[in-house]
Amino acid sequence: VLDYPKLKDAVVTHNHPSGGSFSVDDIKFLKRVPISELRVVSERGSYYIRRPKEWPQEINSSVKIENTIKDIKKELRPKYQKMYNKKEINKVERHQMFSDAVIRLFAERYGLDYGQEIHG
């Protein structure tokens, strides 16, 4: 069991071997635990997302976060599926690009600091 008070203002890093950005569970963790930043590392690079000073009303609970991300996925999925169907991208690229686009749009809409750092 995590000792949440000890994580206050910490930067928590974990890996995503698939190369994708943050999951819904990652965002809910950022909301639930008093860390300042969450990072995910893959062989291509890393993503970061920083908690806002105050969570907007629209995403101030786990259920609201889940529903919001579900709606964003529904909005963006056709674009990436179309690229995949036209063989412009492969399955791995589709996953990586789609997951990044979903969290990028989520962050832009709700004022979270999000970005990617490419390695090497």
Regions found by a protein language model. Give the residues of each.
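Divalent-metal-activated hydrolytic enzyme cores
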Residues: 35-120
